[in-house]
Amino acid sequence: MSVKTHLPSAPSDTSSRSRCFWLRLQAKAFLVLGMRSKAHAVFQDILEIHPQDVLALNSLGFNELNDRHLVQALGFFERALVLTPTLANAHFNVGFVCEELGRSQEAEHAFRAAIQIDEKMDRAWYGLGLVLVRQRRFEESLVAFKRNTELQSMSPYAWYQMARVHMEMQAPEKALEVIRHLNGFEPKVAAQLVRETGLNLDRPV
């Protein structure tokens, strides 16, 4: 008489991990194909299986952000931050959405946390500068924007903001210095600032 042997079934947690693995591959394929809504649905399925899946949380957060569903995006990013508190990007994502929502103090806290982890995160310095401007803390904002320009010297964004801040501080000469610097590598942005500020590049310093 033959004896039938039965292999033990895989533990449920192993099955869940395997299913999440294949679902991630499927979601990434949908993203590559530009099928964001289908990828969104797959990431939701992943969270039902594994609520602490950071990739799914961040992906859903970015999807909501792209659709301008800011509160929903913040919810996903905050959940991801709880799971990855030592990652600068996790703090930055929360700060970015808070800044978009006009929640300046929360955004400032998140950007500063990101910088504390990664002092060279240029976009966190830029975000910090923006929220400090919103709070009319102009001197501090200039420090943040200056650090951004040290990390990204050829990016015009912080230079642009610095010129605007100098104008807010009634310092047109300093604004003009920034505009002249910008004119050397981003003449279109410099021209925009000339129109906005009414300053003349030919004006003597």
Predicted regions and their residues:
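Structural signature of tandem alpha-helical TPR/SEL1-like repeats
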Residues: 2-8, 32-45, 66-79, 100-113, ...
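Structural marker of alpha-solenoid helical repeat scaffolds
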Residues: 15, 49, 83, 117, ...
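Alpha-helical segment of the N-proximal tetratricopeptide repeat
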Residues: 15-55, 59-69
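Helix-start (N-cap) detector for alpha-helical repeat units in TPR-like alpha-solenoids
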Residues: 20, 54-55, 88-89, 122-123, ...
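TPR/TPR-like alpha-solenoid repeats
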Residues: 29, 63, 97, 131, ...
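TPR/TPR-like alpha-solenoid helical repeat scaffolds
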Residues: 160-170, 189-205
